[in-house]
């Protein structure tokens, strides 16, 4: 019997391998990879409200992670591994789901930048960012979770392929991205399938850029099939590869004049590549124009500043470039995703070796076609080199010259070997074409020398129009207000857009488009009474305005007016953009009425009609389970999990249906907001028992729970307890114990922004008006929606009860300052904050700013900062203190302050180098004003001397001293001394 079973298993396995073309199935597994990793301190305890943003990066409700160090230690990272006979790839699910490396097993070369240490700098939206591998940027660049754990899973398929899945739902907009990385048996290509999806109730801005770091050397060549490039903001068209200055930027060693950051322009070609003569290896990226039409190259450059970035981001002084692919023309361009809209696209990554360059590429093969001059200038040798991504055993190569076929070569192509063919003694004045076909005669790849899908040069707009300048507010048209508001929304400036729409309605009080836009944005900002007023006025004039009806329905839901909400959704569900989310909302209302069968029918039909809106099917699993149709639910769940195996809600539903998932609970425990995300989906359908079930669970702790720095455990997260108590009350149970527990929990790093939290926190305050935590968190929630007055009212109540709540007085002080209030009043709040929350550096920075606004002396400003008791002041405090001391004439003290702690580099921000040079020039200016010009000139003369205690090198000092700002200051000093 054993022999029969063994034979049966052998037949099955050999049959499976035969279906894979004789190749073994792809392996996928999880283990750990230990790397030297630079330590990160606790995150900033202050909520980064939009009102306080100065750099255009909106992060609330996330913490800021700028507390970086110069100390490294070995760190074991969870690693997801994917391997076939040609490639072995590693993904870090705890670092934004980045692909860390992909090794070409044929030559041991890394396709991407496998930085041997993880060294963080302040580059990402929240701060911490490290250079390596592939980063997934959605809905913003270097997004909020780029250095944090995300959802992940692995899967295998019957064709022998295997996949790694990574995904995330962000907390700022509630938008979701998902990436599936797949290897097929016997193929040397990594497939990347991406889905972008808006499961939230309101529209939000987005873009997508795949960002792949590739290690480079001076002889590395960049193959971007384009004749022109354009700079950020769609400005400054230049030529490629040789720019207008005569520099060939396709050679990395030529990047000597600062960073190179260019987007392809006027090209329809779908590929790009990097090749290293240093290693005879490289990588090619392919995405059709219908998927990702835009390409970008970024390099820090090889000048002094670029070399500093190498030091800041690596321990081995390695250089890398970023090859990027995106949806829009540049990284200043955003679009909108409406509720339940999704986008899908596919990219391919191909390793190349022993091919010398890239002429053309697609997912099947990469071609390098080159001419070798001969002694006779009228003759040439044509060399063809091909890397096949998969096997073509009966391929044929055809060489043509435009008049006919010159030669053919029957060849068996395989990823295991590079194909080369030389065609000698050809006329040099001819143009040659190479075509590769398979055994059926279908074209695998074809190229004609010099022919690319470019916009004809004569049609290329090289002088770009200036950006539209909006007229003064009193001269703006209705369209000006609408487009400016939309532009501000696309840039994340929601409060500015709100002000723009309101200003537009002052000028055009009867404008339906402005009223609709304002009402929609008010819903997004949780300003519900105002939204109901504005959207109702639109419906009064246009009864079938579907957008206004949909958002009015959301507003009525938030106000608890369910019948009004249903009537609004019955209009918006009729057809068009808002039909899918309206069907979802109507199903939720059906369930709240107890009509689960009607809700199921509605969701099932909606899921069939809109398969790209996956949330429509997710809740249907719950309805089937609660209706007793467990087997149907399990069958449907299996289908959904096949397409989205990392979905935490689906994983939880599987567990509710009895399927074992040992890692689910640790995954949920790693971020309490994952638990709330699931609970709120149940609550939205009125399924409070289901919500309570996940909220009351005892979650694990310890090494199995992998969280980002500062993340509280669920059992210490007050919002979990508040939601628990709220659900109990709606179930006619006693929620007092939960509310009481929440009131005693620490609120550090707890920043509410979900609209559902209004009812939850108000219920807690109804139960206990003296709950300081609930007042403080409700104030944060109001502030997140731009409602400063309501926020201050709640914060004042919290202050009277417990002024030591983290960030409370900081929030109040900055709100007074940003409302152009009394700087003296702000200073009082900050002084109180230094006593109640003494380790919070922003209380001291806020006090310094209030004193500055009040016109107090630099010495007083410096004294405020010097009271900070912490051992590791943030860079902002160090730099501001140094500037204030310099302004007070205490230059030696200012320079000493710069040496007090390690300051990580910040892209686009102030650097230690910049502040040092500014201080020295301020000192020279002071000397000149005292007629001590010889001393001033001597100081300027020695400005570029190395400063070992600050790790400032001469080349960097020379470069900074030649900046426009420094030159202007030096010129002013010299002019002063010349008088």
Protein language model features and the residues they cover:
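A contiguous, surface-exposed recognition patch within enzymatic or periplasmic domains that forms
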Residues: 31-41, 47, 78-82, 98-101, ...
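Single-residue signature of alpha-solenoid repeat helices
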Residues: 497, 531, 565, 599, ...
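Structural marker of alpha-solenoid helical repeat scaffolds
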Residues: 507-508, 540-542, 575, 609, ...
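Extended, loop-rich substrate-binding clefts of extracytoplasmic carbohydrate-active enzymes
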Residues: 48-75, 79-83, 131-188, 305-335, ...
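Acidic, contiguous internal or C-terminal segments within carbohydrate-active enzymes
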Residues: 69-71, 83, 90-108, 166-217, ...
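Long, contiguous interaction/recruitment modules in multidomain scaffold/adaptor proteins
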Residues: 358-476, 645-660, 726, 730-754
């Amino acid at each position: 019997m054993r022999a029969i079973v063994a034979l049966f298993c052998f037949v099955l396995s050999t049959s499976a391998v035969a279906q894979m073309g004789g190749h073994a199935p792809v392996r996928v597994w999880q283990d750990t990879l230990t790397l030297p990793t630079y330590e990160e301190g606790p995150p900033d305890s202050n909520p980064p409200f939009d009102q306080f943003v100065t750099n255009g990066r909106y992060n609330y409700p996330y913490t800021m992670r700028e507390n970086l160090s110069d100390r490294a230690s070995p760190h074991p990272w969870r690693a997801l591994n994917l391997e076939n006979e040609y490639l072995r790839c590693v993904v870090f699910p705890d670092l934004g789901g980045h692909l860390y490396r992909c090794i070409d097993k044929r030559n041991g070369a890394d396709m991407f930048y496998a930085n041997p240490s993880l060294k963080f700098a302040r580059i990402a939206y929240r701060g911490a960012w490290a250079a390596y591998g592939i980063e997934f940027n959605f809905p913003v660049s270097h997004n909020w979770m780029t250095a944090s754990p995300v959802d992940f899973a692995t899967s295998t398929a019957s064709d022998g392929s295997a996949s790694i899945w990574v995904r995330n739902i962000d907390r700022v907009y509630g938008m979701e991205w998902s990436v599936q990385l797949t290897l097929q048996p016997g193929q040397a290509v990594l497939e990347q399938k991406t889905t972008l999806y808006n499961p939230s109730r309101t529209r939000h801005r987005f873009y997508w850029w795949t960002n792949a770091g590739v290690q480079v050397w001076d002889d590395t060549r960049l193959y971007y099939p384009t004749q022109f490039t354009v700079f950020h903001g769609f400005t400054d068209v230049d030529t490629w590869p040789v720019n207008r200055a005569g520099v060939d930027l396709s050679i990395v060693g030529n990047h000597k004049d600062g960073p190179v950051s260019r987007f392809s322009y006027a090209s329809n070609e779908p590929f790009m590549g990097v090749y290293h003569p240093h290693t005879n290896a490289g990588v090619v990226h392919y995405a059709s124009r219908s998927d990702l039409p835009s390409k970008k190259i970024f390099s820090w450059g090889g000048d002094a500043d670029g070399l500093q970035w190498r030091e800041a981001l690596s321990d081995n002084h390695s250089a890398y470039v970023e090859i990027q692919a995106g949806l829009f023309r540049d990284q200043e361009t955003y679009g909108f995703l409406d509720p339940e809209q999704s986008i899908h696209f596919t990219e391919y990554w191909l390793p190349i070796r022993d091919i010398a360059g890239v002429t053309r590429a697609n997912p099947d093969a990469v071609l390098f076609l080159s001419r070798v001059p001969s002694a006779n200038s009228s003759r040439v040798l044509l060399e063809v080199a091909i890397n096949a991504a998969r096997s073509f055993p009966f391929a044929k190569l055809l060489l043509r010259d435009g008049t006919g076929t010159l030669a053919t070569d029957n060849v068996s192509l395989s990823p295991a070997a590079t194909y080369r063919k030389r065609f000698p003694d050809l006329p040099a004045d001819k143009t040659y074409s190479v075509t590769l076909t398979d055994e059926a005669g279908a074209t695998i790849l074809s190229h004609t020398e010099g022919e690319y899908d470019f916009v004809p040069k004569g049609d290329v707009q090289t002088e770009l129009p200036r950006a539209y300048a909006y007229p003064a507010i009193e001269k703006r048209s209705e369209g000006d207000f609408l487009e400016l508001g939309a532009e501000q929304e696309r840039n994340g400036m929601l409060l500015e857009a709100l002000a723009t729409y309101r200003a537009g309605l002052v000028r055009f009080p009867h404008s339906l488009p402005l009223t609709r836009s304002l009402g929609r944005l008010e819903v997004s900002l949780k300003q519900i009474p105002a939204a109901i007023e504005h959207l109702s006025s639109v419906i009064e004039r246009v009864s079938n305005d579907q957008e206004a009806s949909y958002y009015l329905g959301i507003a009525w839901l938030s106000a608890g007016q369910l019948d009004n909400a249903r009537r609004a959704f019955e209009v918006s569900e009729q057809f068009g953009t808002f039909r899918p989310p309206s069907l979802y909302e109507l199903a939720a209302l059906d369930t709240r009425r107890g009509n689960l069968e009607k809700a199921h029918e509605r969701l099932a039909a909606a899921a069939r009609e809109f398969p790209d809106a996956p949330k429509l099917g997710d809740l249907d699993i719950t309805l089937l389970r609660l209706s007793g149709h467990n087997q149907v639910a399990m069958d449907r769940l299996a289908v959904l999990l096949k397409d989205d195996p990392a979905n935490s809600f689906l994983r939880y539903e599987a567990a509710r249906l009895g399927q074992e998932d040992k890692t689910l609970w640790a995954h949920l425990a790693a971020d309490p907001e994952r638990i709330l995300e699931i609970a709120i989906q149940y609550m939205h359908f009125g399924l409070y028992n289901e919500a309570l079930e996940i909220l009351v669970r005892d979650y694990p702790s310890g090494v199995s729970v992998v969280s980002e720095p500062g993340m509280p455990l669920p059992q210490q997260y007050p919002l979990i307890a508040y939601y628990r108590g709220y659900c109990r009350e709606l179930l006619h149970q006693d929620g007092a114990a939960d509310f009481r527990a929440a009131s005693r929990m620490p609120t550090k790093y707890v920043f509410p922004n979900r609209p559902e939290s209004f009812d939850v926190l108000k219920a807690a305050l109804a139960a206990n008006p003296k709950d300081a935590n609930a007042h403080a968190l409700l104030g944060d929630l109001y502030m997140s929606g731009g409602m400063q007055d309501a926020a201050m009212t709640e914060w004042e109540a919290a202050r009277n009860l417990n002024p030591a709540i983290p960030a409370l007085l900081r929030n109040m002080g900055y709100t007074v300052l940003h409302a152009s209030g009394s700087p003296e009043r702000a200073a009082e709040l900050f002084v109180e904050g230094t006593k109640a929350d003494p380790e919070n550096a922003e209380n001291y920075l806020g006090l310094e700013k209030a004193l500055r606004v009040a016109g107090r002396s630099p010495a007083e400003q410096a004294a405020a900062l010097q009271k900070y008791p912490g051992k590791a002041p943030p860079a902002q405090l160090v730099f501001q203190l140094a500037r204030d001391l310099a302004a007070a004439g205490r230059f030696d003290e200012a320079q000493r302050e710069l040496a007090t702690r390690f300051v990580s580099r910040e892209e686009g921000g102030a650097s230690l180098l910049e502040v040092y040079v500014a201080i020295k020039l301020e000192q020279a200016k002071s000397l000149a004003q005292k007629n001590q010009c010889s001393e001033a000139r001597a100081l300027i003369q020695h400005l570029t001397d190395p400063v070992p205690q600050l790790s400032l090198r001469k080349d960097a000092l020379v470069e900074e001293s030649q900046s426009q700002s420094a030159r202007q200051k030096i010129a002013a000093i010299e002019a002063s001394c010349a008088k």
